[in-house]
């Protein structure tokens, strides 16, 4: 699964996920992409599950790019622990997603195969997504 190799600080504040994606909002590497239209978080497990769904569907063909990286640690306290005594330990990592962000890209497969692969991947993600293709001349 994806997670940072090293971090300057182990824990991070919650923050607010606002605005729309101004970077990573167009298909850059492949021919087709899966674009998020919702705001939210994708965990490393969700990204991996979607990647596996795409890989299984396209079999040996095509090349896949993952355009997001889970670099934000989410900490939780253990069950039945009293409040206080500091912040919990980092449990997993998430990628913060704004509307318009391209999550996956694919090249080397027909459009129908890419559409079906992304439909299967979208079922693994908690956000609404849409299928996009590369703009000619962009």
From Swiss-Prot:
Enumerate the InterPro entries for this protein.
Ribosomal_uL16, Ribosomal_uL16_bact-type, Ribosomal_uL16_CS, Ribosomal_uL16_dom, Ribosomal_uL16_sf
Q: Which GO terms describe its cellular component?
A: cytosolic large ribosomal subunit
GO MF annotation: an example: tRNA binding
| Keywords per UniProt | Ribonucleoprotein, Ribosomal protein, RNA-binding, rRNA-binding, tRNA-binding
**What Gene Ontology biological process does one annotation of this record name?**
translation
Query: Do the record's keywords include Ribosomal protein?
Result: yes
- Pfam families referenced in this protein's UniProt entry, alphabetically: Ribosomal_L16
- PROSITE patterns referenced in this protein's UniProt entry, alphabetically: RIBOSOMAL_L16_1 (PS00586)
Indicate, by first and last residue, each region the UniProt record lists as having compositional bias (Basic residues): 1-13
State the SUPFAM superfamilies in the record. Answer: Ribosomal protein L16p/L10e
The ranges of region (Disordered) come to 1-22
Q: How does it assemble?
A: Part of the 50S ribosomal subunit.
Query: In which family does this protein belong, per the annotation?
Result: Belongs to the universal ribosomal protein uL16 family.
Q: What does this protein do?
A: Binds 23S rRNA and is also seen to make contacts with the A and possibly P site tRNAs.
Enumerate the PANTHER family for this protein: 50S/60S RIBOSOMAL PROTEIN L16 (PTHR12220), LARGE RIBOSOMAL SUBUNIT PROTEIN UL16M (PTHR12220:SF13)
Q: Please give the name of this protein.
A: Large ribosomal subunit protein uL16
Q: Which gene encodes it?
A: rplP
């Amino acid at each position: 699964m994806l997670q940072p190799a090293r971090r300057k600080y182990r824990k991070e504040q919650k923050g607010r996920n606002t605005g729309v994606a101004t970077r990573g909002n167009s298909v850059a590497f492949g021919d087709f992409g899966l674009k998020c239209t919702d705001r939210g978080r994708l965990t490393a497990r969700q990204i991996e599950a979607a990647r596996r769904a795409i890989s299984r569907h396209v079999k040996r063909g095509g090349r896949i790019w993952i355009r997001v990286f889970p670099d934000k640690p989410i900490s939780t306290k253990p069950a039945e622990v009293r409040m206080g005594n500091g912040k919990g330990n980092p449990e997993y990592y998430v990628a913060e997603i704004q509307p318009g962000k391209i999550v996956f890209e694919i090249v080397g497969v027909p459009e129908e195969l890419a559409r079906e692969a992304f439909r299967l991947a979208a079922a693994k993600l908690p956000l609404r997504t849409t299928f996009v293709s590369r703009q000619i001349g962009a």
